[in-house]
A protein has these predicted regions:
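Helical hinge/lid and interdomain linker segments adjacent to catalytic or ligand-binding clefts
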Residues: 2-75, 230
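C-terminal domain-boundary segment and adjacent tail
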Residues: 29, 182-202, 231-233, 237, ...
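A short, acidic, amphipathic alpha-helical segment used as a generic capping/interface helix at domain edges
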Residues: 121, 125, 364-380
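A glycine-rich, often tryptophan-bearing local segment used as a flexible ligand/cofactor-contacting loop or short
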Residues: 44-111, 117
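Metal-dependent polysaccharide deacetylase catalytic core of the NodB/CE4 family, i.e.
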Residues: 205-208, 219-220, 227-310, 314-331, ...
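Extracellular ligand-binding/catalytic regions of CAZymes and related secreted enzymes
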Residues: 141-202, 396
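A conserved mid-domain beta-alpha-beta active-site/ligand-binding segment of alpha/beta enzyme cores
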Residues: 115, 345-371
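Catalytic beta-strand/loop cores that center a nucleophilic Ser/Cys/Thr
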Residues: 16-21, 84-149, 338, 343-346, ...
Length: 396
């Protein structure tokens, strides 16, 4: 046995989820050797694959898949239900989760015994079956990862008024935690260690980055924030909407020790592929003329679409950051319309100081909000990636 996941079916979503979990992958064919420690079913299996899955379970194997794919093993309810959230259960079979926004439909397993739906029905089956262990979900996690629709989502905070931002409809970071928790259950429940690669480089326990979207900030506001970076010794990444700073764009080329990326020329999304590409090209050209070669990109308003992704890939950026694709998650490669995009996504926590200010938070409440977010991320092993704007103030 090799500690890795076997995958039945080609799935960009599952491959990306398993990479984020730090789990190696091998493609599986019915009749092949069982050179894996857990089996993921990413599509409806054919008869030969179904027999293979049954034999694997009978030998004490561990299987994960949706109720739509594993209905011959675990009965599902006949009526499809809407699932806005998956609600965690302290002490349940799959732990370590927060509320998971999914906004999808699915078939609940009849024998579901853990996690809860919006109306507090059990949502997931996790337990013994046919001689082995299985985790059966009412949805396909790999398919959910590819959902790039955005919604206005509220974020937990201590004050009564919760901050909100338009972000990915599916909580993709939480989805990764769910898959990792399910894999841990399938391994530990069979007396097998759940070994995984660290998400952080060079043995680091965590990483931190500060993204600044300039959003028309004045030269003075940018200078004040740059001074804080230098005083604290924390470098920032500046995403510049070049047209707003045309009179003093060269100042960004003199930001030693900082990273400067592109936030388009105009701070707008045209919803027209040609115009959006031109907005990117024009901004990149303006920065080049000012002495800045931008290798990173962030779309205005955190917008993401397959057209924007193609434009980002075409421009040759090393990474981009759009919370309409993902927020509060590990870096990942997006995919849509049967295409996997080459530019790495680096998700951030999407609540900026300006959002808290609009909610009426005092400086003390703002500080407490970010302390709470940092503490939760450290406990859960999530990267500390935040974003702000020069004009929002409250830097003390």
């Amino acid at each position: 046995m090799i500690l890795r996941a076997g995958l039945i079916g080609s799935s960009s979503g599952w491959e990306e989820l398993l990479r984020q979990c730090g789990v190696p992958i091998v493609a599986v064919k019915a009749g092949g050797e069982e050179t894996f420690s857990v089996l993921i079913v990413a599509r409806p299996p054919d008869p030969a694959e179904t027999s293979f899955i049954r034999r694997y379970l009978a030998g004490g194997g561990g299987v994960m898949g949706s109720s739509a794919y594993l209905e011959t093993l675990v009965e599902r309810r006949e009526e499809q239900v809407h699932l806005a959230h998956i609600v965690p259960e302290p002490g349940g079979e799959i732990g370590g989760l927060s509320l998971m926004d999914i906004e999808t439909t699915g078939f609940l397993p009849r024998e579901a015994n853990c996690l809860r739906t919006d109306d507090l029905q059990f949502a997931v089956f996790a337990g013994s079956i046919a001689g082995g262990l299985a985790v059966v979900t009412p949805f396909d996690p790999g398919e959910l990862l590819g959902d790039f629709r955005a919604v206005e989502r509220y974020f937990y905070a201590r004050p009564d008024r919760l901050p909100s931002e338009r972000v990915a409809r599916v909580a993709k970071g939480e989805l990764t935690h769910f898959v990792a928790g399910a894999l841990k259950f399938l391994h530990h429940g069979r007396g097998i260690p759940f070994a995984r690669l660290s998400p952080f480089p060079a043995g680091a326990h965590n990483v931190c980055a500060i993204r600044i979207d300039t959003d028309g900030g004045t030269e003075e506001e940018v200078g004040d924030l740059l001074a804080i970076s230098r005083e604290t010794g924390i470098p920032f990444t500046w995403f510049v909407d070049a047209g707003s700073h045309s009179g003093w764009l060269g100042e960004f080329s003199r930001m030693t020790g900082q990273e400067v990326g592109l936030h388009c020329y105009e701070h707008r999304i045209f919803l027209d592929a040609r115009k959006d590409e031109e907005n990117i090209r024009r901004g990149a050209a303006a920065l080049e003329k000012a002495g800045v070669h931008a290798e990173a990109f962030a779309a205005p308003f955190g917008f993401w679409s397959s057209d924007i992704a193609r434009a980002i890939d075409g421009a040759g950026f090393r990474y981009s950051s759009e919370f309409a694709w993902a927020c509060d998650a590990y870096p990942q490669h997006p995919f849509a319309d049967f295409a996997r995009y080459s530019t790495l996504q680096v998700p951030v926590h999407p609540v900026a100081i300006g959002t808290l200010r609009r909610c009426g938070y005092t400086p003390a409440q703002m500080s407490q909000y970010y302390r709470d977010v940092v503490a939760a991320k450290v406990v859960r092993g999530e990267p500390l990636f935040f974003y702000q704007h020069p004009g929002h103030g409250h830097w003390d």
